[in-house]
Amino acid sequence: MRGAGPSPRHSPRALRPDPGPAMSFFRRKVKGKEQEKTLDVKSTKASVAVHSPQKSTKNHALLEAAGPSHVAINAISANMDSFSSSRTATLKKQPSHMEAAHFGDLGRSCLDYQTQETKSSLSKTLEQVLRDTVVLPYFLQFMELRRMEHLVKFWLEAESFHSTTWSRIRAHSLNTVKQSSLAEPVSPSKRHETPASSVTEALDRRLGDSSSAPLLVTQSEGTDLSSRTQNPQNHLLLSQEGHSARSLHREVARTGSHQIPTDSQDSSSRLAVGSRNSCSSPLRELSEKLMKSIEQDAVNTFTKYISPDAAKPIPITEAMRNDIIAKICGEDGQVDPNCFVLAQAVVFSAMEQEHFSEFLRSHHFCKYQIEVLTSGTVYLADILFCESALFYFSEYMEKEDAVNILQFWLAADNFQSQLAAKKGQYDGQEAQNDAMILYDKYFSLQATHPLGFDDVVRLEIESNICREGGPLPNCFTTPLRQAWTTMEKVFLPGFLSSNLYYKYLNDLIHSVRGDEFLGGNVSLAAHGSVCLPEESHSGGSDGSTAQSSVKKASIKILKNFDEAIIVDAASLDPESLYQRTYAGKMSFGRVSDLGQFIRESEPEPDVKKSKGFMFSQAMKKWVQGNTDEAQEELAWKIAKMIVSDVMQQAHHDQPLEKSTKL
């Protein structure tokens, strides 16, 4: 396996070959351990040097900086640094087949492609919405229209309470360890020994108990918990801790610099314990305030959302409410950080089942999608993992004669996802048959839709498919990376500047505009009955009627505008001219000069009229009276006279030479 590149550090041994990132990582780790050993040796030498009265003043500064709390904090920091370094090295580690290589027409491989981490910003789950600060305001607006915003606010406050409570408990445990280490009397035989290891072990045990709970970081908007900013308190706690540690070192320096009797040593030790207790009292008070703030936040959340007297209580059972009360008012006087977890699950399920699907179809989510699409940072994952965007992208790829690349990526990614979901419990022969379908279509020498993969990739796919036990879930990883890179580097920039992309945006904007007008009418109907006390009923009704008429007029104008600019393709069909939907029976005849249709063929005399026709004629006579042919002839004569008079006035100089025959 080749290294990712040369080491960024400059050393005198630059001519030596680079050992790779793994060796450089181990070298840094060993160097860090050597520095820690050097610090431990220096601190031990400083503690031993206290016995000599000549060096007491010189080592006074070393004593102030070598307290047990300082060593414990250094140990924690070293562990965190080593963990972060190892994690960074693991993330940067790449197998040999992930090296950058050129794929000809398909471009260069994408080293950052990881299918399990790809997700679209345009399609969200409820958990992603609650943790995303961009889409969360839109979800809050949607829930406010439904008068269910208290569900979202409770979930956010409970999540923030859960995370901050665990951080406060860790800070309280750290302060307790420091107080116990400061208040412990020092024996004459172990007066000059540094209890760094014991403090570190006790701290690890205490923090290990609370590390089982996940520390969730949630950025909630609108939460008003009493004391959520614990950074100033922690800073003050650390400063008090350093002050108490320095007082302890001064006391040790005074008592250890001279040889005094045993009684004097006992009295000085009692004096040191008293001074340490007095110095640790502010630390204890701040720690108590920290724990009281946890209780206060829990009570505030319970009063706002869980109490039966709350303005908008969340939908939970009485048994669950009693369980929350028992966890807040524990027997040991401590608040359980997980007291709201069950209520959170109930609220989450209610939002997901009753509201979230409607939110995804609302104009609020369309507004969020428009914000993402117009932000200027649209990635390929946003397009491929969103159904609506994928539809327009597939049309663009079809116009570019590259739809086979997209179809291969979708099919191969779906195949690998299904195999990975089965976790090794799948039929190898069946999986091999499915993989051979993709191979015959895109990779073989007789492929129906060849994509241009070279022989190296084809041989790799053959070896991955034709293996004992069936193909692995990552058998198409290399061509998937190639197809992903090609779409990302070659086709995505063109799509983002194409007419299809702007059509997609236009469709979203039109849907938002129409839904806003419809939503305005719904909200107006919902709030129209609510009037202010000083307003009369008639005034409120008139105002609501006027507003509704304005809304309807706006909708009518909008619809007319949309209909005016949209050309129906069906209206351009020439065959539609010969379609006479409401035409009756065909008959032969002619049209006179007056526009009268004169039948030339009489109906068959032997055909009897149907009962329906006879009934209609009877009803016509009963309603309109007697309509015989004489009256109809008279009407046509009157019409003829009117037409003749008009013609004579128009052509007064020319006599009427011929008359119109009826």
From Swiss-Prot:
This is A-kinase anchor protein 10, mitochondrial. Residues 125-369, 379-505 form the RGS domain. Differentially targeted protein that binds to type I and II regulatory subunits of protein kinase A and anchors them to the mitochondria or the plasma membrane. Although the physiological relevance between PKA and AKAPS with mitochondria is not fully understood, one idea is that BAD, a proapoptotic member, is phosphorylated and inactivated by mitochondria-anchored PKA. It cannot be excluded too that it may facilitate PKA as well as G protein signal transduction, by acting as an adapter for assembling multiprotein complexes. SMART domains: RGS (SM00315). GO terms for biological process: protein localization. Residues 634-647 are annotated as: PKA-RII subunit binding. GO terms for molecular function: protein kinase A binding. Residues 1-55, 178-205, 242-280 are annotated as: Disordered. PROSITE patterns: RGS. RII-alpha binding site, predicted to form an amphipathic helix, could participate in protein-protein interactions with a complementary surface on the R-subunit dimer. Residues 32-43 have a biased composition (Basic and acidic residues). GO terms for cellular component: cytosol; mitochondrion; plasma membrane; protein-containing complex. The gene is Akap10. It comes from Mus musculus. Residues 1-28 form a transit peptide. Keywords: Cytoplasm, Membrane, Mitochondrion, Phosphoprotein, Repeat, Transit peptide. SUPFAM superfamilies: Regulator of G-protein signaling, RGS. It is found in: Mitochondrion; Membrane; Cytoplasm. Its main location: mitochondrion. The modification Phosphoserine is found at S52, S189, S281. The keyword Repeat applies. Highly expressed in testis, kidney and lung, followed by brain, skeletal muscle, liver, spleen and heart. Also expressed in brown adipose tissue and pancreas. Residues 256-280 have a biased composition (Polar residues). The keyword Transport does not apply.
